[in-house]
C-alpha cells in the first residue's frame, strides 16, 4: 500500500498554525525586564538552539519515514521509547491546561466587571467547546480551521502594528530574568514539539527541504509571537494576555477569533496525548483519552496558577534535550538507523545522566549565556558516542 505524501506547503502550514499561539505570546512577555534589544536577542538565540534540534528530529523521521516515537526507538528500544511517550503525554496535558486558561482569560475581556468566581465557568465552557470539536472530528473540519487561521494571522498582524506604533513604557515587574534563562525559555518551545515533528515530516518526498521549511516556518513564526509578547508587555506595562488585548483595543470580534484559534490549538495537544498513550497501551482509544485530557486540563486551569509555568518548561527541556542528543549521536555519528533492542539500556542510561545533569545544574542556579539546553546537549552527545563505542 502506497503511503500518501504530504506537500511541503501543507506541512509548513501545520507548523505556522502551531506557532500562532497565546501561550507563545504570554511567554514572550516574560522577557520584558531585559528590554527590547536584549530580549529579542535572547529570543532569536534560544530559537536557533531549539530550532536546530527541531530540524534534526524532523530530518531523522523524514529520512527513515518513521513517526516521532518510532525514531526514538532507534536509541532507546521498542519498549524503552514508551517512557518518552508517557512523558510526552504529561507535557501535552500541561499544555492543554495552559491553553484552556489563556482562552478563558481572553473571554474575560467581554465581562466588564471581572469576577474571579466566574473564571471556572469560563474554563468549563471553553473546555466543552474543545470536547465537541474533538468529537466532531477536528482533523476533518478544514474549512473552519483555514478561516480561523487566516483571521488569527490578521489579528496578530494588527496587534504587531499597534505595538510597533506605540512607545515603550516602564514595566512594573516583580522579578527579573537573566539572559541565559531567557535563552533557555526560548529554546524549550521548539523542544516541546520534538515528540511529534516527525509525524508530519515522515511522508515527505524531499526530506531535507521539507524539514528545513518546517523548521524555518515554526521558528520564525514562534519568534514573531515571542517578540509580539515582549513588545506588548513593554508598550502596555502588563504581562497578562487579557490586559494586553484589552489595552490594545481588541474588539468582540477579535476576542471571538482568539477563542476559535485557541479551541483549535488546544485540541491538538489533547489529541496528541491520546496518540501518545495509545502507543503505550494500544487498547486505549485515542478520542476518549483526548476528552479525558481536556477534562484534566479544565480542572488544572481552574485550580492551579498554570500561567506560572516556567518550571514546566524547564521540565520539558530536561527530558527532551538529552533525548534528542542521544538520538542525534546514534543516527548521524554512529549511523544507527534501525531498532535493535526491545529496551536499550545504554541509550536510556546516557539519557538519564543528561536528565540528572540538567536538573542538578538548574538546582544549583548555574547557567551559561546559552541557557542549560545547549551545554547539556553537547555533554550528552559526547557521552553517548563514548559510551556506545566502549560498550560496542
Task: Go through each PLM region and give its residues.
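Juxtamembrane transmembrane-helix boundary signature
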Residues: 44-76, 83-91, 388-391
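Membrane-interface "cap" regions at the ends of multi-pass membrane proteins
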Residues: 1-38, 178-183, 195, 202-209, ...
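Membrane-interface loop-to-helix entry segments
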Residues: 121-163, 173-174, 214-218, 314-325, ...
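Hydrophobic transmembrane alpha-helices that form the core helical bundles
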Residues: 81-114, 263-279
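C-terminal membrane-solvent junction of multi-pass transporters and transport-like membrane proteins
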Residues: 174, 325-390
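Transmembrane alpha-helical segments of multi-pass small-molecule transport proteins
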Residues: 13-19, 85-89, 111-136, 148-160, ...
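Membrane-water interface regions at transmembrane-helix termini and the short interhelical loops
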Residues: 29-33, 59, 105-113, 125-148, ...
Amino acid at each position: 500500500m502506497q503511503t500518501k505524501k504530504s506537500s511541503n506547503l501543507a506541512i509548513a502550514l501545520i507548523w505556522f498554525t502551531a506557532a500562532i499561539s497565546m501561550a507563545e505570546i504570554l511567554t514572550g512577555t516574560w522577557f520584558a525586564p531585559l528590554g527590547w534589544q536584549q530580549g529579542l536577542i535572547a529570543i532569536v538565540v534560544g530559537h536557533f538552539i531549539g530550532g536546530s534540534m527541531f530540524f534534526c528530529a524532523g530530518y531523522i523521521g523524514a529520512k527513515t519515514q518513521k513517526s516521532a516515537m518510532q525514531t526514538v526507538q532507534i536509541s532507546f528500544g521498542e519498549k524503552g521509547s514508551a517512557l518518552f511517550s508517557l512523558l510526552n503525554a504529561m507535557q501535552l496535558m500541561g499544555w492543554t491546561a495552559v491553553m484552556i486558561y489563556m482562552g478563558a482569560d481572553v473571554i474575560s475581556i467581554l465581562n466588564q466587571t471581572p469576577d474571579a468566581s466566574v473564571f471556572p465557568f469560563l474554563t468549563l465552557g471553553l473546555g466543552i467547546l474543545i470536547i465537541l470539536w474533538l468529537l466532531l472530528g477536528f482533523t476533518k473540519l478544514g474549512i473552519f480551521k483555514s478561516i480561523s487561521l487566516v483571521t488569527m494571522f490578521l489579528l496578530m498582524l494588527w496587534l504587531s502594528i499597534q505595538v510597533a506604533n506605540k512607545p515603550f513604557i516602564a514595566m512594573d515587574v516583580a522579578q527579573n530574568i537573566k539572559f541565559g534563562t531567557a535563552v533557555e525559555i526560548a529554546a524549550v518551545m521548539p523542544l516541546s514539539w520534538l515528540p511529534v515533528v516527525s509525524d508530519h515530516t515522515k511522508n515527505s518526498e524531499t526530506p531535507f527541504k521539507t524539514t528545513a521549511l518546517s523548521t524555518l516556518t515554526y521558528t520564525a513564526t514562534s519568534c514573531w509571537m515571542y517578540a509580539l509578547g515582549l513588545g506588548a508587555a513593554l508598550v502596555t506595562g502588563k504581562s497578562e494576555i487579557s490586559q494586553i488585548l484589552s489595552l490594545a483595543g481588541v474588539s468582540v470580534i477579535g476576542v471571538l477569533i482568539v477563542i476559535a484559534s485557541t479551541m483549535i490549538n488546544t485540541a491538538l495537544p489533547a489529541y496528541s496525548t491520546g496518540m501518545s498513550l495509545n502507543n503505550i497501551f494500544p487498547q486505549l482509544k485515542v478520542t476518549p483519552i483526548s476528552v479525558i485530557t481536556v477534562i484534566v486540563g479544565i480542572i488544572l486551569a481552574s485550580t492551579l496558577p498554570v500561567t506560572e509555568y516556567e518550571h514546566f518548561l524547564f521540565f520539558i527541556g530536561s527530558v527532551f534535550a538529552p533525548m534528542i542528543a542521544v538520538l542525534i549521536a546514534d543516527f548521524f555519528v554512529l549511523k544507527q538507523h534501525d531498532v535493535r533492542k526491545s529496551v536499550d539500556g545504554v541509550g536510556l542510561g546516557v539519557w538519564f545522566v543528561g536528565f540528572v545533569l540538567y536538573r542538578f545544574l538548574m538546582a544549583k542556579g548555574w547557567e551559561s549565556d546559552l541557557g542549560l539546553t545547549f551545554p547539556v546537549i553537547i555533554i550528552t552527545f559526547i557521552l553517548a558516542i563514548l559510551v556506545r563505542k566502549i560498550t560496542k
